[in-house]
């Protein structure tokens, strides 16, 4: 997925 700062979004 992609990580930006404190937010992490898994690839779905």
UniProtKB/Swiss-Prot annotation:
TM ranges: none
UniProt main location, coarse: secreted
Subcellular location: Secreted
InterPro entries associated with the record: Periviscerokinin
Presence of keyword Secreted: yes
Modified residues (Valine amide): 12
One of the GO biological process terms: neuropeptide signaling pathway
Example of a GO cellular component annotation carried by this entry: extracellular region
Signal peptide limits: none
Keywords per UniProt: Amidation, Neuropeptide, Secreted
Family statement drawn from the similarity comment of this UniProt entry: Belongs to the periviscerokinin family.
Functional summary from the UniProt entry: Myoactive peptide; has excitatory actions on the hyperneural muscle.
Protein name: Periviscerokinin-2
């Amino acid at each position: 997925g992609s990580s930006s700062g404190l937010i992490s979004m898994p690839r779905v």
